Design a protein with these regions (language model features):
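Periplasmic/cell-envelope proteins involved in peptidoglycan metabolism and beta-lactam response
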Residues: 1-296, 384-396, 405, 504-507, ...
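Extracytoplasmic
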Residues: 49-52, 59, 66-72, 123, ...
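Soluble non-cytosolic domains of exported or imported proteins
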Residues: 51, 85-93, 130-135, 195, ...
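Beta-lactam-recognizing serine transpeptidase/beta-lactamase-like catalytic domain environment
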Residues: 65, 220-234, 238, 271-317, ...
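Preference for bulky hydrophobic residues occupying beta-strand positions
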Residues: 73-75, 174, 245, 311, ...
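Bulky hydrophobic/aromatic "packing anchor" residues in well-ordered structure
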Residues: 140, 172, 205, 339, ...
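Residue-level detector of short coil/turn "hinge" positions at structural boundaries
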Residues: 151, 270, 334-335, 397, ...
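Ligand-recognition elements built from short beta-strands and adjacent flexible loops
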Residues: 505-508, 522, 531, 552-724
Length: 724
């Protein structure tokens, strides 16, 4: 019996010795097998790394669009409970400590956090918030690590697109929407959060703006705490590229303001305009608006069609200078030749001029806008030459701008023309164009005959500001000689000096332009509507060496305003005047007489209407007021503050019950808009404006007792109500 016992002891001893030796050898001499053994126990999860969508800037570097990422924050109460026991701490004391840390590192209220931690005892994990910003999250993680507090879990929640200038360029910039990409086998994720551009620049450059997902492997223990682990893999996310546009937001604002004003004044269905640098093809402003745009949510405006690219219209008499190009080029007319105008019979069709002018020279035909004169010249040009010239000017095809929604226009081949098409084309009928096509064609007239490719993105940069791609002017082709285009420009200058556009002539800058009026085509037919028109004006300045080409068009303006000379031309003039008054904007040919009589525009925002009128009257400004109300304050003005203004140029003052949110935060002497701000941020803004606060609740400010934009009087406190 004793020998058997000794034998068993020896056997177990040897087994223990062999096992210990094996483990020792495995750890010292064969770490890879041990590592594989560990991997059998811990299978890493993959955490998705979401890229930040790229930002969009204007030509001056002003931010137009950016992104904010939000994260979800959860607390594992089981882990906190175990930690509290180890620390010999009451659970409520532990919750209070966590609440304090979170509130100190974010805009969250400690009281609200504590309430959430005590909700529903059956839940192990409690969501604290899904609106934690990245900087707040970094502070929270750092503090939890420093104080060795367990139970913190976080994940990406959402991304929000911020349009810094509100409704400005809304249709051009477009919009995004969150989408799910479905299951991704690489990251083993069921859905990938993504903001997808659905219209405008956001959609056209979506692949560049979106960025690329990344991932990293993470290992959790039984308490769902991350644990350090060797040899984990990671693929960094790539943030989206940034876009710098050719759009000058100051010019864009001037254009949009004039278009909104005109849309209301002339009761138009839609209004559009494009400003282009003819020497480069850079688009300086591109706007399309409807009268109701300012009364609806900006998000709804962003998804509307980009009118200057998509809306097709017959250009009317604005086509006449372009018809004259091949006639001069092939010497089919002489500069001093007189052509009989007034009435012209073509088969069964009678072509008439608005007025019976008699015989006119080519310059007078353009200045007086004679249909008969240009139709007779078109007969000399012939089908083939006119068709080829219009094709070389870009009609019937997209411009190559690269934005979604651009139309090609409608321009039939000569085989599809009838006996009247040649004559109709000469004065802008039987062809449909877009504003972009038209302004690009006239830019070639402005620059000496070079057809430039229009572009709207100046450069693409990464998040560090490094230029990835710089776009340069591109000449597509020569459409005429400089001598011919100079002559056409002189004809267009005669329109302003002595013709149909003389009412928009300015003392301090020369303009070459052309008015146009066209009946709208009845959809699905070749007939025309009796009461619906498109009015157009295209001009360039200074006339001698144009630095800008500007086209304005109205879709279905009210009767009496349906002529290009009565709606589009006055709007053109207003835009040009306001551009010329922009600080630091130098147009060659700009007469010094204007600067000698200019005054600096005062900042009237936030002032009571009576105060604003007193200031304007003191300096002799001409002005008009929109939305008059005896209790109103100035909520907007045009031109903006500190701009040099001709006192004889009418100023527009818009009044209402309060300023916009952005203005209310900066205008002194008025109540700022605190809604949507955190309590901490609201306190900072209120202190800057010297407004005492009474605070109810915590989290985000939802209501305030003093209306934004109201004049601040005395020391009355503003009560704000906040909630998460």
């Amino acid at each position: 019996m004793r020998s058997r016992y000794i034998f068993l002891v020896i056997i177990f001893g040897l087994a223990t010795l062999v096992w210990s030796a094996y483990l020792f050898a495995l750890q010292i001499f064969d770490p890879f097998k041990l590592d594989r053994f560990r991997q059998l126990r811990y299978i890493p999860d993959k955490e998705i790394l979401i890229p930040t969508r790229g930002s969009i800037y204007d030509a001056n570097g002003d931010l137009l669009v950016s992104s904010i990422s939000y994260y979800q924050l959860d607390i594992d109460r089981k882990a906190v409970s175990l930690w509290a026991k180890k620390q010999k701490m009451d659970l409520q004391e532990a919750y209070a400590r966590i609440s304090k840390v979170l509130s100190n590192c974010s805009a969250l209220s400690a009281g609200d956090i504590l309430k959430r931690l005590n909700l529903n005892d059956k839940l192990t994990s409690i969501q604290i918030s899904n609106k934690i910003r990245e900087m707040e999250l970094d502070r929270i993680i750092s503090t939890f690590d420093k104080e060795k507090i367990p139970g913190l879990n976080y994940s990406f929640a959402s991304m929000r697109r911020i349009y810094s200038k509100d409704i400005l360029a809304a249709r051009l910039l477009g919009s995004v929407q969150p989408v799910s990409d479905g299951y991704d086998p690489e990251t083993r994720s069921k859905s990938l959060y993504k903001l997808n551009g659905i219209c405008g620049i956001e959609a056209s450059y979506n692949d560049l703006l979106a960025g690329e997902y990344g991932w990293r492997e993470v290992v959790y223990d039984a308490n769902h705490e991350r644990v350090p682990y060797p040899n984990l893999h990671e693929k960094q996310s790539q943030d989206g590229f940034n876009l710098k546009l050719t759009i000058d937001s100051k010019i864009q604002e001037i254009v949009e303001h004039a278009l909104y004003e005109g849309a209301v004044k002339y009761s138009a269905k839609n209004v559009g305009a494009i400003a282009m640098d003819p020497n480069t093809g850079r688009i300086l402003a591109l706007a399309g608006v409807s009268p109701e745009d300012r009364n609806i949510d900006p998000g709804l405006v962003r998804v509307k069609s980009n009118i200057p690219l998509s809306f097709m219209f017959e250009p009317g008499s604005t086509m006449k200078p372009l018809t004259m190009l091949p006639a001069l080029e092939h010497k089919l007319v002489r500069p001093n030749e007189k052509i009989a105008c007034g009435v012209y019979q073509v088969g069964k069709r009678t072509i008439r001029d608005t007025h019976h002018y008699g015989a006119l020279t080519p310059k007078e035909i353009i200045a007086k806008s004679s249909n008969v004169g240009v139709a007779k010249i078109a007969e000399r040009i012939g089908k083939k030459r006119l068709y080829e010239k219009f094709i070389s000017l870009g009609y019937g095809q997209k411009t190559g701008l690269g934005l979604y929604g651009e139309s090609s226009g409608l321009f039939r081949k000569p085989d599809d023309w009838d006996g009247y098409t040649l004559h109709s084309l000469s004065f802008g009928q039987a062809i449909s164009v877009t504003a972009l096509q038209h302004v690009t064609a006239f830019s070639a007239v402005a620059n000496g005959g070079k057809m430039m490719k229009p572009y709207i993105v100046d450069s693409i940069t990464n998040k560090t500001g490094q230029v990835i791609q710089q776009f340069e002017p591109e000449v597509l082709r020569e459409i005429a000689s400089k001598a011919v285009t100079d002559t056409i420009r002189s004809y267009m200058k005669a329109v302003i000096d002595d013709g149909t556009g003389k009412h928009i002539k300015m003392d301090y800058i020369t303009i070459a332009g052309k008015t146009g009026t066209a009946q709208k085509n009845v959809e699905g037919t070749r007939g025309y509507s009796s009461g619906k028109y498109t009015s157009v004006f295209v001009g360039m300045f200074p006339a001698e060496e144009p630095k800008m080409v500007l086209l304005v068009f109205y879709d279905e303006p009210a009767p009496g305003y349906h002529y290009g000379s009565t709606s589009a031309a006055p709007t053109f003039k207003k835009i040009v005047e306001d551009i010329l008054f922009m600080p630091n904007y130098n147009i060659i040919g700009f007469d010094e007489r204007m600067t000698q009589r200019s005054l600096q525009m005062p900042d009237l925002r936030g002032k009571h209407i009576s105060q604003a009128e007193a200031i304007l009257n003191k300096y002799g400004f001409l002005y008009k007021i929109e939305g008059v109300d005896s209790s109103s304050v100035v909520i907007d003005q045009f031109p903006k503050a500190n701009v040099s203004v001709d006192p004889h140029h009418p100023i527009t003052i818009k009044v209402g019950s309060g300023l916009s949110k952005a203005d209310s935060l900066t205008v002194k002497g008025t109540m700022p808009d605190l809604t949507g701000l955190t309590i901490r941020r609201a306190m900072q803004v209120a202190a800057k404006h010297k407004v005492p606060l009474k605070i109810k609740g915590s989290g985000i400010v939802r209501q305030q007792s003093i209306l934004p934009g109201s004049l601040i009087t005395g020391t009355a406190a503003c009560t704000i109500e906040a909630s998460i």
